[in-house]
Amino acid sequence: MNKKCKIWIGAMLFMTAFSVGASRAQTCIQPPSCDTLGYTMTADQCGDAVKFLKCPLDQSKMFCLTQEEIDGNAVGHVGDILYSDKTFSTELIKSKTPIGVVFDEANHLAVSLDQTQLAWANSYEDIPTLGNCSDGLTCSTNGKQNTEAIINYGKANNKGYPAAEYCVAYKPSTVYQDETWYAAGAWFLPSVKELNTLYANKAAVNAALTKVNATTLGNEYYWSSTEASSNYAWNLWMADGGRGANGKNYSNEYVRPVLAF
């Protein structure tokens, strides 16, 4: 092989290698940063942490957890996630089972992660043990007592009250035990006053419901356990907090169980 041929072949091999290298360079993937890996804290910010890891790319960046973030808080605040072990947290603890979201800190009430649409009653009839309330904020304000009165009257008189019955039968879908403080029998249909508190904290509650991938409160009418008359029961429009009464057999209103913890 003459000298010119060798030079030409060498040049071709060089160009081929360069072309392959350039092609590979175009498909390079940007390496992850400490931030994208979750190492977003500094040593000072991790002062109360009980568990922490340093970023392998930058030792000054850390991931850390406090004991409260690991175990949950023993006291529930508005917008906190309520777990099956009766602890609470602002952010989701993946090792725990969420069952509700706190909406009334003073009265220790949490709303369920689910809802449905049902009628308040199958027929028009007054429940003697419930007050016929002209003001839902000062009359029959205890939803648990109201629900018990509705259920007891229905059983004694062979009457159907779908909204209250749904709440009493409700339990979180992740619960398999029947004898726990949050299982069937513990939940109730909230009073209109309790719904009013739920509406006041709707933004915080919906933020928490989103964190646990649960159904958020919609801009819909929600039934309460507060009776207005033999034909009507109180409801609340979750869009603006407006309160009113509707026919008990109207089946398109929403029902959201509540739990006392």
Model-derived features with residue positions:
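Short linear Ser/Thr-Pro motifs
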Residues: A17, S112, S224-T226
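Bacterial N-terminal signal peptides
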Residues: G10-S19
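Short hydrophobic beta-strand that contains or immediately precedes a catalytic carboxylate
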Residues: V111, L189-P190
